[in-house]
C-alpha cells in the first residue's frame, strides 16, 4: 500500500514538473521563430537556385558572357547577391535563437513575479534593444520583399511573351535585356519569337522552374516580414508585462517595508507599556 502511494506521488511529481516546464515555454516566440526560419529558408534556398538558373538562361539563350577583369556586370551582381543570401541565412539563424532565449527569460520573469526572481535593469534594456532591432529588421525585410518582386515581374513578362507566341500565330515579339537594365544601353542582347533560342527557352523547363523559384522566394520574404511583425507584438507585450512586474515588485517592497515598520512600532510600544506596568 505504501509503495503504491509512493509511486503515485512520484508520478504526480513528474506530471507537475512536465506541466511546469510546458508552462514556461514562450509559445508565441516559438511560433514566430518557426515562421522566421521557414521564411528565411525558402527565401535563401529558392533565391539561390533561382539566381543560378538565371545565370544559365542568360548564358544559354541570350548568349551573354562574363566580362573579363574587374568590371561590374550582371554575373558579378548575381554572385554578390548569393553571398548576401549566405549572410542572411547565418545572421537570422542566430537572431532567431537569441529571440527564443529572450522569450524564455521574459516568460520566466513573468511566471516568477512573486518569487525570488528579480527583473534587472539590464534585462529591461535588452528587451528594448530587441524591439528596436526587430523593427529595423522588419523594415529591411520589407525592402527585400519589394526587391524580390522585381525578378518575379521580369520573369512574368517573359512567360507572358512565350504564352502569347503560342496562342497568337505570326506574332513578332522581342525580348530586349536593355529594358530590364541587365546590360548597358550600348549592348544589344535581344531575342525575338522567330529565333531558335527563344523557342528553346520557352519550351525548356528551366524558365518555368526559375520563375516559380522566384515566386517561392518572394513568399519566403513575405513570411519573414510576418514573423518580424509577430516578434514585435510578442516583444512589446513582454516589455509591458515586465514593466508592470517591476512596478508590482516596487509596490510589494514598499508594502513589506511599511508593514515591518508598523510591526516594529507596535513591538516598541508594547515593551514600553510592559515596562511602565512593571
Swiss-Prot record:
Keyword terms: Acetylation, Cell membrane, Cell projection, Disulfide bond, Glycoprotein, Lipoprotein, Membrane, Neurogenesis, Palmitate, Phosphoprotein, Synapse, Transmembrane, Transmembrane helix
Places the protein is found: Cell membrane; Cell projection, Axon; Cell projection, Growth cone; Cell projection, Dendritic spine
Biological processes annotated in GO: neural retina development; neuron migration; neuron projection morphogenesis; positive regulation of filopodium assembly; regulation of synapse organization; response to bacterium; stem cell differentiation; synapse assembly
Chain ranges on the Extracellular side, renumbered to this chain: 44-84, 149-213
PTM description: N-glycosylated. Palmitoylated by ZDHHC17/HIP14.
Regions that span the bilayer: 23-43, 85-105, 128-148, 214-234
Tissue occurrence: Widely expressed in the CNS. Found especially in the granule cell layer of the cerebellum but not in the molecular layer or white matter. Expressed in the immature embryonic retina including the nerve fiber layer (NFL), inner plexiform layer (IPL), and outer plexiform layer (OPL). Weakly expressed in processes of Mueller glia cells.
Disulphide linkage map: 174-192
GO terms of molecular function: calcium channel activity
Residues modified to N-acetylmethionine: 1
Residues with PTM Phosphothreonine: 278
The keyword Oxidoreductase is annotated on this UniProt entry: no
Function: Involved in neuronal differentiation, including differentiation and migration of neuronal stem cells. Plays a role in neuronal plasticity and is involved in neurite and filopodia outgrowth, filopodia motility and probably synapse formation. Gpm6a-induced filopodia formation involves mitogen-activated protein kinase (MAPK) and Src signaling pathways.
Family that this chain belongs to: Belongs to the myelin proteolipid protein family.
Name assigned to this protein: Neuronal membrane glycoprotein M6-a
Organism: Mus musculus (Mouse)
Name of encoding gene: Gpm6a
Amino acid at each position: 500500500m505504501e509503495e503504491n502511494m509512493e509511486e503515485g506521488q512520484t508520478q504526480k511529481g513528474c506530471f507537475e514538473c512536465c506541466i511546469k516546464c510546458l508552462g514556461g515555454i514562450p509559445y508565441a516566440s516559438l511560433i514566430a521563430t518557426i515562421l522566421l526560419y521557414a521564411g528565411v529558408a525558402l527565401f535563401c534556398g529558392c533565391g539561390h537556385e533561382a539566381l543560378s538558373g538565371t545565370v544559365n538562361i542568360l548564358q544559354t539563350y541570350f548568349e551573354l558572357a562574363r566580362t573579363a577583369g574587374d568590371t561590374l556586370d550582371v554575373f558579378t551582381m548575381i554572385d554578390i547577391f548569393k553571398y548576401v543570401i549566405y549572410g542572411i541565412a547565418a545572421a537570422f539563424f542566430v537572431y532567431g535563437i537569441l529571440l527564443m532565449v529572450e522569450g524564455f527569460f521574459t516568460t520566466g520573469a513573468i511566471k516568477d513575479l512573486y518569487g525570488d526572481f528579480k527583473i534587472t535593469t539590464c534585462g529591461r534594456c535588452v528587451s528594448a534593444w530587441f524591439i528596436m532591432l526587430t523593427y529595423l529588421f522588419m523594415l529591411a525585410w520589407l525592402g527585400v520583399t519589394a526587391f524580390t518582386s522585381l525578378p518575379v515581374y521580369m520573369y512574368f513578362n517573359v512567360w507572358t511573351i512565350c504564352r502569347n507566341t503560342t496562342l497568337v500565330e505570326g506574332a513578332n515579339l522581342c525580348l530586349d535585356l536593355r529594358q530590364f537594365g541587365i546590360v548597358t544601353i550600348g549592348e544589344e542582347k535581344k531575342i525575338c519569337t522567330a529565333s531558335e533560342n527563344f523557342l528553346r527557352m520557352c519550351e525548356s523547363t528551366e524558365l518555368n522552374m526559375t520563375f516559380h523559384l522566384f515566386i517561392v522566394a518572394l513568399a519566403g520574404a513575405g513570411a519573414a516580414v510576418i514573423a518580424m511583425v509577430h516578434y514585435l507584438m510578442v516583444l512589446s507585450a513582454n516589455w509591458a508585462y515586465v514593466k508592470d512586474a517591476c512596478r508590482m515588485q516596487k509596490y510589494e517592497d514598499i508594502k513589506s517595508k511599511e508593514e515591518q515598520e508598523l510591526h516594529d512600532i507596535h513591538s516598541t510600544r508594547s515593551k514600553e507599556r510592559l515596562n511602565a506596568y512593571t
